[in-house]
Amino acid sequence: MSSIELGKQAEYPEQYSPDCLEPIARSLSRSGLGLNASALPFTGLDVWTGYELSWLDLSGKPQVAIGYFEFDAKTDAIVESKSFKYYLNSFNQTRFESWAAVQTLMQQDLANASGGDVNVRLEPLSAVSPLETPAGQCIDDCPLEAAVYTPDAALLKVEQGEVSEQLFSHLLKSNCPVTGQPDWATVWVSYRGNKITPESLLAYVVSYRQHQDFHENCVEKIFTDIMAQCAPVELSVYARYTRRGGLDINPFRTNCGAALPGWRIVRQ
């Protein structure tokens, strides 16, 4: 991991440069969770939003857009965030024939870098959705049962009796494994099964406070821990992280084919 560009000083490219993109194999994290790429217990997406996206049209006139980048959870690799930022900035002084040409090129480059399916959507600023509150119950006012700051699945508790509900917390904090910078997020859990006590889920969320890992890996650990400890019939986990360098990362994992929630929260 020491070879990646995150945390290093580098010059921003002045022209289109797909070589900026730096993949990190998903297997590096998944092996520690006992996950096999050929038999994943979930499907999902990593949804990145790019807020600082610009290029030139053929006349040299700047274009600006909001970019939505959806990486299938089955891709071989995630893309290191700083390299993604450098890649997007390489479009700033490059001329393109159309928005469609930019979108197609980005989709090809990101698919090549990640080794799998990627969907890219560019939208004008006027099309951006308003802020929303996640569906379900916020658990942040529950008392904290244990002040533990490293992930501990044993904190999760269930009560007998099947329910179908959605719980969320704004208190998720993890940390970049390269720079140590804090990563802040709202995490949303939708499930059907024995009732997860809100207090125990809150304690579990808080236990990530000193944990170092990438966003995507944190969500997969949350998913696998809840499955192992609580055994829900259906489970979806979604984290909306705050943006850094004009990009936010929003991993979603589900075992029931649930639709990706479309909301954007207040810290984004």
Curated annotation (Swiss-Prot):
GO biological process: queuosine biosynthetic process; tRNA modification
Residue numbers binding substrate: V79, E80, S81, H215, E216
Chief location: cytoplasm
GO cellular component: cytoplasm
Catalytic site: C176, D183
Protein name: NADPH-dependent 7-cyano-7-deazaguanine reductase
Catalytic reactions of this protein: 7-aminomethyl-7-carbaguanine + 2 NADP(+) = 7-cyano-7-deazaguanine + 2 NADPH + 3 H(+)
EC number of this enzyme: 1.7.1.13
Location in or out of the cell: Cytoplasm
PANTHER family documented for this protein: NADPH-DEPENDENT 7-CYANO-7-DEAZAGUANINE REDUCTASE
Assembly description: Homodimer.
Pfam families membership: QueF, QueF_N
Organism: Saccharophagus degradans (strain 2-40 / ATCC 43961 / DSM 17024)
Cysteine disulfide partners in this protein: none
Alphabetical UniProt keywords: Cytoplasm, NADP, Oxidoreductase, Queuosine biosynthesis
A Gene Ontology molecular function term of the record: preQ1 synthase activity
Annotated residues for binding of NADPH: S81, K82, R244, G245
Function: Catalyzes the NADPH-dependent reduction of 7-cyano-7-deazaguanine (preQ0) to 7-aminomethyl-7-deazaguanine (preQ1).
The gene coding this protein: queF
Classification via InterPro entries: GTP-CH-I_C/QueF, NADPH_dep_7-cyano-7-deazaG_red, QueF, QueF_N, QueF_type2
NCBIfam families referenced in this protein's UniProt entry, alphabetically: QueF
Family per similarity comment: Belongs to the GTP cyclohydrolase I family. QueF type 2 subfamily.
Pathway(s) the chain acts in: tRNA modification; tRNA-queuosine biosynthesis
